[in-house]
């Protein structure tokens, strides 16, 4: 089970990090348009 938990955490970080980065760029772009 420990391996599955670690894999879940690694996958979550792998997805959340780029997503958060894209969201920050998107928010900055929208703010500039306003």
Swiss-Prot record:
Entry keyword set: Chloroplast, Membrane, Photosynthesis, Photosystem II, Plastid, Reaction center, Thylakoid, Transmembrane, Transmembrane helix
One GO CC term, this protein: photosystem II
InterPro entries reported in the protein's UniProt record: PSII_PsbM, PSII_PsbM_sf
Signal peptide: none
Gene Ontology biological-process annotations: photosynthesis, light reaction
Subcellular location per the Swiss-Prot or TrEMBL entry: Plastid, Chloroplast thylakoid membrane
Transmembrane segments: 5-25
Topology in the lipid bilayer: Single-pass membrane protein
UniProt KW Oxidoreductase keyword: no
Main location as per UniProt: plastid
PANTHER family found in the cross-reference section: PHOTOSYSTEM II REACTION CENTER PROTEIN M (PTHR35774:SF1)
Subunit structure: PSII is composed of 1 copy each of membrane proteins PsbA, PsbB, PsbC, PsbD, PsbE, PsbF, PsbH, PsbI, PsbJ, PsbK, PsbL, PsbM, PsbT, PsbX, PsbY, PsbZ, Psb30/Ycf12, at least 3 peripheral proteins of the oxygen-evolving complex and a large number of cofactors. It forms dimeric complexes.
Known function: One of the components of the core complex of photosystem II (PSII). PSII is a light-driven water:plastoquinone oxidoreductase that uses light energy to abstract electrons from H(2)O, generating O(2) and a proton gradient subsequently used for ATP formation. It consists of a core antenna complex that captures photons, and an electron transfer chain that converts photonic excitation into a charge separation. This subunit is found at the monomer-monomer interface.
Similarity annotation: Belongs to the PsbM family.
The protein, known as: Photosystem II reaction center protein M
Naturally occurring in which organism (per UniProt): Ceratophyllum demersum (Rigid hornwort)
Lineage of source species: Eukaryota, Viridiplantae, Streptophyta, Embryophyta, Tracheophyta
Gene: psbM
């Amino acid at each position: 089970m420990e391996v599955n938990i670690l894999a879940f955490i690694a996958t979550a970080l792998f997805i959340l990090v780029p997503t958060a980065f894209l969201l920050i760029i998107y928010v900055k772009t929208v703010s500039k348009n306003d």
